[in-house]
């Protein structure tokens, strides 16, 4: 009998150990998944707090954001900024890094995921639109203006890369936005419709429309949009344009990779460019005046001409700042290249 009890006890111990190991493995996987979900490509400053928030745009899409606040602001009513971009990135990447820095400088800052991307709502996933993404900035202004510690008459916005174009477009129509800054600005409608440096021919444009039009039959039959295998190559061959290599160095390496970023993964839908090729942004750029514009671009950025052309076409007050030796993606995360002191002085001067 004692022997039988011993065997039973031993068996229970083995089963208990196996169960404990299984739970430990499950907990580890859960922790790893949580760490991936909560992964940021930068360290949070000990001078600020970060809080996950949600809000809706006027199309009813729930947007996800992170609200950064300076710890020393207390009950003070302060100026605020909304930040988004780059095009195809998420708030845990560049926009969060900018928010982190600008909150240190005394602003309430909202970094957010645009509609249909990241943790924000909208289906199908990974689509963009001149209308929706312009509206996303105004929805962010709605949210900031409802915060008890924000002066709703002192709200500005920052757009990075393609969201620089949307930030300018939002500022044209939303007169609550008192100042706008862009870094490494892209006009997504222009590059989609005309190609880089406006070199797309009429024949190439027609072929692009034909290809996407036929793709719509496939998408309609399947009941879901098609995606490319990957936005960027998994490995570089070496003969890619330099700006593609630069994008790879950010999005496909630990420097900037994030599982929610479509630029790090499979990319936009194959038909995503349709509306951008037919609906130009920035038609009324002069109407931002008399509110100020700050355009920041890298000296060696392939995208520099977008900022230069906006500067030519916009009315005063406006300023173009060229960062020596910088390429496009340097202004995503290289804090020694991004002129945060200039951004601070620009917004403090114009949000008062």
Regions found by a protein language model. Name each.
Residues 101-121:
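Conserved alpha/beta-hydrolase
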Residues 127-148:
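Alpha/beta-hydrolase active-site loop
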Residues 88-100, 114:
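The serine-hydrolase catalytic nucleophile loop
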Residues 288, 294-297:
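Short beta-strand/loop motif that positions the catalytic acidic residue
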Residues 30-76:
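N-terminal cap/lid segment of alpha/beta-hydrolase-fold proteins
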């Amino acid at each position: 009998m004692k022997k039988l009890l011993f065997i039973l006890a031993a068996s229970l111990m083995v089963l208990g150990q196996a169960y404990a190991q299984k739970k430990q493995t499950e907990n580890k996987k859960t922790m790893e998944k949580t760490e991936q979900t909560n992964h940021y490509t930068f360290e949070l400053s000990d001078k600020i707090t970060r809080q996950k928030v949600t809000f809706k745009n006027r199309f009813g899409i729930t947007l996800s954001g992170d609200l950064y606040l300076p710890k020393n602001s207390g009950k003070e009513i302060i100026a605020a900024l909304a930040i988004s971009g780059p095009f195809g990135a998420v708030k845990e990447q560049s926009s969060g890094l900018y928010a982190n820095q600008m909150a240190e400088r005394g602003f309430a800052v909202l970094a957010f995921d645009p509609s249909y991307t990241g943790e924000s709502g909208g289906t199908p996933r990974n689509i963009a639109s001149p209308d929706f993404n312009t509206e996303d900035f105004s929805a962010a202004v709605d949210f900031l203006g409802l915060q008890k510690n924000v002066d709703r008459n002192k709200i500005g916005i920052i757009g990075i890369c393609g969201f620089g174009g949307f930030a300018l477009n939002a500022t044209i129509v939303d007169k609550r936005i008192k100042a706008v800054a862009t870094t490494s600005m892209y006009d997504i409608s222009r590059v989609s419709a005309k190609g880089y440096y406006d070199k797309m021919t009429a024949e190439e444009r027609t072929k692009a429309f034909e290809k996407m039009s036929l793709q719509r039959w496939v998408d309609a039959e399947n009941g879901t949009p098609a995606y490319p295998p990957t936005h960027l190559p998994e490995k570089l061959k070496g003969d890619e344009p330099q700006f593609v290599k630069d994008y790879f160095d950010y999005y496909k390496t630990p420097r900037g990779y994030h599982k929610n970023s479509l630029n790090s993964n499979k990319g936009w839908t194959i038909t995503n460019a349709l509306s951008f090729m037919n609906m130009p942004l920035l038609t009324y750029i002069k109407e931002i005046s008399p509110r100020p514009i700050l355009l920041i671009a890298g000296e060696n950025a392939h995208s520099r001409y977008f900022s230069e052309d906006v500067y030519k076409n916009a009315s005063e007050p406006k300023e173009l700042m060229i960062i020596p030796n910088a390429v496009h993606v340097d202004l995503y995360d290289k804090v020694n290249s991004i002129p945060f002191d200039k951004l601070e002085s620009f917004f403090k001067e114009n949000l008062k």
